[in-house]
Amino acid sequence: AYSTAGWLGLTDQQIIDTIDEMKKNGFDCFKMKVGLNIKEDKKRLKFIRSHIGEDAKLMLDANQIWGVNEAIAHMKELTEFNPIWIEEPTARDDVEGHLKIKNALKKYDIGVATGEQVPSPVIFKQLLTTGAIDFCQIDATRLGGVNDVIAVILMAKKYNIPVCPHGGGIGLCNMIIHYAIWDQISVAKTQKNQYVEYLDFLQDEVFKSKLKVKDGHYIAPESHGWGLEINKDFMNNHIYPTGSVWIERENSGNILFKG
């Protein structure tokens, strides 16, 4: 599994604290957001790489902020930090653009990952059949349900592209672990390059069944179904407009309710 340490907006110390907490759980794969400013990206990547060590895996994520040529130019500036992939380097449905980026970065051993914003198996088919991506990042809720997810996983197997599910959303990690277990045992039949995203702060206190990791890997869940039964306290605190979360926002002046 891997997790994001280098969120935009965090201070250097907050990033270091996040990395240290991840290391306690055995993580050796870390992701950082990039794209707004090349000088700032280099500065943050330098201390992140030094803190995680040269042997740790580093992923970069641009969240579709670049055009194709801009993505290539920006990533060439970051090759010294040895990232294993650049995630969402350009628009989600620009298949030709992803292929151009992939071909340009191949000599630097930087892969292209995308898929968390792709809503259709047809777009995944185009990305896979053209060889435009190195890592297939399905989103369990962006696609149209279990059948669509299964279709994409099977297509990825046909083209020998590892599936690395997106987990950046409340409940997503609870769902993708089931797909990952099935894929790694029965479809891909390997864990090689099958990086599954893990974000604990999007799960804590929300669900009765908490996800667990050990030595940087998910522990198979024991709860029934997806494991998405919500804690009553969390639900009550977030009920609109009577929950404590909304009342606090109203009292702070950040949001006003009209009777």
Locations of regions flagged by a protein language model:
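Basic, gly/Ser/Thr/Pro-rich low-complexity segments located predominantly at protein N termini
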Residues: 11, 40, 136, 221, ...
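Shared catalytic-loop signature of beta/alpha-barrel
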Residues: 82, 93-225
